[in-house]
């Protein structure tokens, strides 16, 4: 008798799908919520988790940013149900314009948080490599964690060790018809340009596939950041009532993370420019004035050095 997930018959030989099934096994729970766009990555993830006998609720978000988005979202939900998953369709509004990608991501995660406290997403090793390069262009090369936390939502990324070729190949093996987002072919989006132009060029220069090395660098950046963040968390009480200038002697990376934590604890948005100027109040103190960090009802918020501490005044 053929193996089934829902009404979908599984092929006897499916090497790409097997890679995904192996990838999800360390993360499995009885019931998993998965963000499903209908694209090959998330569709293959839903199938892999179902094949491993977990229950799945697919959450399909319609961002209302493209013509026909409602049809795409409902088709994704229908494919999930065909495989035996439950599916929820939720419509959200995202303001178009500059920064639309980030705004859509924030709105999507906010919608997930209304429906569950943990969401699985289908980022692959290829996404990890692209994220690392994009971060490097902003001066902050970093990677994605396989498990990360937002205030009201845990995010699980079980496919960071799998390739995009595996998810696309699995859809072919299973006879699934994923949606292909037209924006993924538009090099006006920086991530797409990285994918379609930069990584192929790196492959030529490198003489081989650059993705595993970039993904490894991203993972190491994540691991290093976790060490520093752990130290910051343990020492947070030290700057509960102002940031002591005695911390100027800490290693640069740790000190700047501590400063950023101090500022965020006071509700201040952190930028590299602000952090550089505030750090100089510690490491290059010449009696300079305060650093503007925002506004309050009484005027301008500043970080100033007084009585052996950095403090926020207005």
Swiss-Prot record:
**Enzymatic class:** ligase
GO biological process entries: tRNA modification
**According to its UniProt record, which reaction does this protein catalyse?**
cytidine(34) in tRNA(Ile2) + L-lysine + ATP = lysidine(34) in tRNA(Ile2) + AMP + diphosphate + H(+)
The alphabetized UniProt keywords are:
ATP-binding, Cytoplasm, Ligase, Nucleotide-binding, tRNA processing
Q: Name one Pfam family in it.
A: TilS
Binding residues annotated for ATP, in chain numbering = 37-42
Checking Gene3D superfamilies in the record gives: HUPs
**Compartment(s) of residence:** Cytoplasm
Q: State the SUPFAM superfamilies in the record.
A: Adenine nucleotide alpha hydrolases-like
Please give the GO cellular component terms listed in this UniProt entry. cytoplasm
Top-rank taxon: Bacteria
A single GO molecular-function term is: ATP binding
Which EC number(s) does the record attach to this protein? 6.3.4.19
Q: What is its main location?
A: cytoplasm
Q: What does the record give as the function of this protein?
A: Ligates lysine onto the cytidine present at position 34 of the AUA codon-specific tRNA(Ile) that contains the anticodon CAU, in an ATP-dependent manner. Cytidine is converted to lysidine, thus changing the amino acid specificity of the tRNA from methionine to isoleucine.
Q: Which PANTHER family does the UniProt record give?
A: TRNA(ILE)-LYSIDINE SYNTHASE-RELATED
Q: What family does the entry list?
A: Belongs to the tRNA(Ile)-lysidine synthase family.
Q: Which NCBIfam families match?
A: lysidine_TilS_N (TIGR02432)
What does its UniProt record remark on the domains? The N-terminal region contains the highly conserved SGGXDS motif, predicted to be a P-loop motif involved in ATP binding.
Name this polypeptide is given: tRNA(Ile)-lysidine synthase
Which organism does this record belong to?
A: Corynebacterium glutamicum (strain ATCC 13032 / DSM 20300 / JCM 1318 / BCRC 11384 / CCUG 27702 / LMG 3730 / NBRC 12168 / NCIMB 10025 / NRRL B-2784 / 534)
Q: Which gene encodes it?
A: tilS
């Amino acid at each position: 008798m053929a193996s089934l997930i829902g009404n979908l018959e599984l092929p006897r030989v499916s090497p790409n799908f097997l890679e995904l099934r192996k990838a999800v096994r360390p993360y499995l729970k009885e019931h998993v919520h998965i963000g499903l766009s209908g694209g090959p990555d998330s569709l293959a993830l839903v199938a892999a988790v179902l094949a491993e006998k977990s229950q799945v609720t697919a959450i399909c978000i319609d961002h209302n940013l493209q013509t026909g988005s409602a049809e795409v979202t409902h088709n994704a939900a229908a494919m999930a149900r065909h495989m035996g998953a439950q599916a929820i369709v939720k419509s959200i509004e995202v303001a178009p314009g500059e920064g639309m990608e980030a705004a859509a991501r924030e709105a999507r995660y906010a919608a997930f948080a209304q429906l569950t406290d943990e969401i699985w997403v289908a980022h692959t090793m290829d996404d990890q490599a692209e994220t690392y390069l994009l971060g490097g262009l902003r001066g902050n090369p970093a990677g994605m964690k396989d498990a990360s936390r937002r205030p009201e939502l845990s995010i699980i990324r079980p496919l960071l060790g799998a390739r995009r070729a595996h998810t696309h190949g699995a859809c072919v093996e299973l006879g699934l018809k994923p949606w292909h987002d037209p924006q993924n072919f538009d090099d006006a989006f920086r991530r797409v340009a990285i994918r379609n132009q930069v990584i192929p060029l790196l492959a030529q220069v490198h003489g081989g596939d650059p993705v595993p090395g970039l993904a490894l660098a991203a993972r190491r950046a994540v691991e290093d950041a976790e060490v520093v963040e752990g130290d910051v968390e343990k020492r947070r009480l030290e700057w509960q009532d102002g940031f002591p200038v005695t911390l100027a002697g800490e290693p640069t990376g740790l000190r700047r993370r501590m400063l950023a934590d101090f500022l965020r604890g006071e509700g201040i948005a952190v930028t590299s420019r602000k952090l550089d100027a505030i750090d100089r109040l510690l490491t290059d103190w010449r009696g300079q004035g305060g650093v503007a960090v925002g506004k309050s009802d009484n005027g301008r918020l500043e970080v100033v050095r007084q009585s052996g501490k950095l403090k926020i005044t207005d």
